[in-house]
Amino acid sequence: AFVAADGQVKIYEAMDVTSLAHWTLIDSFPVGEGPSKDEEGNHCLSWCTSKFAAQMMVVGCAKDHVAKIFRQDLNNKWQACEVLAGHGGVVHDVSWAPNMGRSYHLIATACKDGHVRIFKLTDDSQGGALAGGWTRKMFNVECIADFADHNAEVWRVEWNITGTILSSSGDDGKVRLWKATYTGDWKCMSVVSAEDGPSAFLR
């Protein structure tokens, strides 16, 4: 899946897994307008990879300076649900953490305002109802970490395969690695610059 310049998410599927040169468009839906002419960047998205959750994705909505959770309703139509707010500029990147047995989800965002943010999504047992009688499970959204260590625009965030370490990169030319302590506080565990050798990752 990707977000086109016109704000449409387009989802493709390889109908024949033995021939990955051919992909078929299976769905398309709008998420909003792109950034204004005086802003750089565009939309971004990341899938929820959990095998035990319904199909979901988080989309960075450039012009709105937020990220939104999208998932399918009973008619298999994609709907905007929760909003990840609090950004002071265009959301350049989003990354949904792999869920390795956790009872909650983690989503990281990289923002033009120079901040890396981590959001925690926990199930709301009350659920919620949308127009048409569709009842869906909702998430309580909480920003549990907000870092400005890059002191510059942040462009990329990415989780490791277990969703326990987050990497971020920005215009300061550094990659920062973040990990939660035993108390649940997220801390920078390593900083790697372009001038550092491979041994920098072993610190």
Name every feature range the model reports, one short phrase each.
Residues 10-50, 56, 66-95, 123-151, ...:
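Inter-blade linker and blade-boundary elements of WD-repeat/beta-propeller domains
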Residues 91-127:
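Loop/turn-rich, solvent-exposed surfaces of beta-rich toroidal or solenoidal domains
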Residues 163, 172-174, 181-183, 192-196:
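A short, acidic, flexible beta-alpha connecting loop/helix-capping segment that sits on the rim
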